[in-house]
Amino acid sequence: MSDVKKVVLAYSGGLDTSVILKWLQDTYQCEVVTFTADLGQGEELEPARQKALKFGIKPENIFIDDLREEFVRDFVFPMFRANTIYEGEYLLGTSIARPLIAKRQIEIARATGADAVSHGATGKGNDQVRFELGYYALMPGVKVIAPWREWDLLSREKLLAYAEKHGIPIEMKHKQGGSPYSMDANLLHISFEGRHLENPAAEAEESMWRWTVSPEAAPDAAEYVDLEFEKGDLVAINGQRLKAHELLAKLNELGGKHGIGRLDLVENRYVGMKSRGCYETPGGTILLRAHRAIESITLDREVAHLKDDLMPRYASMIYNGYWWSPERQALQALVDHTQQTVNGWVRIKLYKGNVIVVARDSKTDSLFDPTIATFEDDQGAYNQKDAHGFIRLNALRMRIAANAKTKRG
């Protein structure tokens, strides 16, 4: 079909990417390298190796990489420094994983001499954009193969027929007690799409949720947790310092137990359509609330407001696939600069789906001055008479406008 010699496929070992693997071999007559990323999705990844071997992939062309620490340290934490939320709700669990997968695919392509990369994203979704913008940003001349935009296997029936014809194992997981939904998981979240969720008027079934108990079934006793931050990043939980991915895993455990982090939303995809999805982001929900709390005591007011103004733009960059763009990197530099003083601890209370901040402090960088903020006698620390001139000057433009309106009648 083309002069592609070797292609690196983002390979999960599931039905779709297994069909893609065989299709690449048959259609492009090229050597295939498989790459499977461990992002903390909680699945056994060794079967992906065994499946690749059955397709004739050379052992040296099978890559299964543990990227959990890099994912949280270099992608999730930088995003949370900006308090990033897309369209007021979505914590970008899928979006933030794609730049890392693309990065590693390109690294493998360079190491193995591959001239092409391939992914399993459909032509309807955001992931095709996220993957491919990453590929081109990191390796401008790379050939990109997107099977869902090329082949004629455009229905589930055709995909299954192709798999059966070529001896590809068909795992009907939902018949074995698994999920019938299209799912994506990593350490930050798990998402659910498809089936009856395509009807936005239908409530999600309780049996769908994997990581969280329902708030109604959560413990009747609240749990207090202390979180410590350094330069905007979480470094310890209840005094225990852990690696970045271990911290997020611990927050997921705590949040899941208390029914925290469920989300059912209709989002605006970059390609133009609206899509309904359900998400569980227990650890991320806790982290966002706690990070905003420590910022509230350590950030200057105008800096905090500037961050809030810029955050929706930053969120759109990540959602739409522009992680590797110069504008995202420039904005990240600004965000990271603001985090130099975001040091301290936050105490939260977890209770039946709620994350409640109950205390926060910073020994080194707190801007909260109790001698000024007190409602008691401040011993002259704040001269209330100064407020008169402050108010009159701020009212000047409105007084001028009112006078002009009076003259006009």
Swiss-Prot record:
One of its GO terms (molecular function) is ATP binding. It catalyses: L-citrulline + L-aspartate + ATP = 2-(N(omega)-L-arginino)succinate + AMP + diphosphate + H(+). GO terms for cellular component: cytoplasm. L-aspartate binds at T122, N126, D127. One of its GO terms (biological process) is urea cycle. Homotetramer. Belongs to the argininosuccinate synthase family. Type 1 subfamily. This is Argininosuccinate synthase. It comes from Azoarcus sp. (strain BH72). The gene is argG.
